[in-house]
Design a protein with these regions (language model features):
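Active-site metal-binding motif and surrounding structural segment of the metallo-beta-lactamase
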Residues: 41-92, 120-122
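Active-site metal-binding loops of divalent metal-dependent hydrolases
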Residues: 12-13, 65, 96, 165, ...
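A glycine-rich helix N-cap at a beta->alpha junction
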Residues: 109-121
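Structured loop/turn residues at beta-strand edges in well-structured enzyme cores
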Residues: 2, 52-55, 114, 132-134
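Conserved beta-strand hairpin/beta-sheet module of binuclear metal-dependent hydrolase folds
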Residues: 2-50, 86-88, 150-152, 159, ...
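Short helix-capping segments at alpha-helix termini
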Residues: 82-85, 108-112
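Generic structural signal for residues in well-ordered beta-strands
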Residues: 7, 116-118, 136
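Metal-dependent phosphodiesterase/nuclease catalytic metal-binding core
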Residues: 122-222
Length: 222
């Protein structure tokens, strides 16, 4: 299984873009699933320039509704419409963003060709996404308006079966899944082989926290 866990910094300038930097946008690749974190103006242009898979993004997380963090979103959503996207898109953001986006489509007399699902964030410590590999939890930021960071936690991978043990104990295929989950091997003669003799520890789990505009507080350290 792929162990991809990579962040692409698409923009990092504060408040306004500069001649060299765009405002806040990041793309996280985890096991070839792509998560967009904030979407400032120029985001889709930068993604094209960086040859990032813009159409593979299915989940967008917006920290707050100051323009330098979301003003590129409407353009990206319209581009998805024009490019014929049909796959559902999930958008996580504080209250208010759905109204803004729906207004943009309404006044231009467009209806998106793909489903958009808005998930409104009200508080920190809220798990907003989970799949077989990762969870995403909100973090309340200290800012003038409702603002949230997002903590991506990788789930613990299954244990790795040792090739020598697989051959030595002639492990049946139907027991491999249980052994990778940490269970011991029970042989036909009743012998119990401890799991630690059969497997190796998996790689350590990783995490990534996207914390945007905020005042300092020690609660973020954990």
């Amino acid at each position: 299984m792929s162990r991809n866990f990579r962040t692409y910094i698409i923009g990092c300038s504060a408040a306004t873009p500069t001649s060299e930097r765009h405002t806040t946008t990041q793309l996280l690749n985890h096991h070839n699933k792509y998560f967009l974190l904030d979407c400032a103006e120029g985001a889709q242009k930068q993604m094209r320039r960086m040859r990032l898979p813009m159409m593979k993004i299915d989940h967008i997380f917006i920290s707050h509704l100051h323009g330098d963090h979301y003003l590129g979103l409407a353009g990206l959503l319209f581009s998805y419409h024009l490019l014929g996207r049909t796959k559902a898109l999930h958008i996580y953001a504080p209250d208010g963003l759905q109204e803004i986006i729906e207004l943009q489509f309404r006044v231009s007399d467009h209806k998106p060709a793909y489903p958009m699902h808005f998930h409104i964030i009200y508080e920190g410590g809220q798990q907003v996404f989970e799949d077989k590999n990762i969870t995403v939890e909100t973090i309340a930021m200290n800012h003038r308006i409702p603002t949230f960071g997002y903590l991506f936690r990788e789930k613990q991978a299954l244990r790795n079966i040792r090739k020598d043990a697989l051959e030595y104990y002639n492990i049946p295929i139907e027991q491999i899944s249980n052994i990778k989950s940490g269970k011991d091997l029970v042989r036909e003669n009743g012998e119990i082989v401890p799991n630690h003799k059969l497997t190796k520890d998996p790689p350590a789990s990783r995490s990534f926290a996207f914390c945007s505009d905020t005042g300092y507080t020690e609660q973020y350290v954990d």
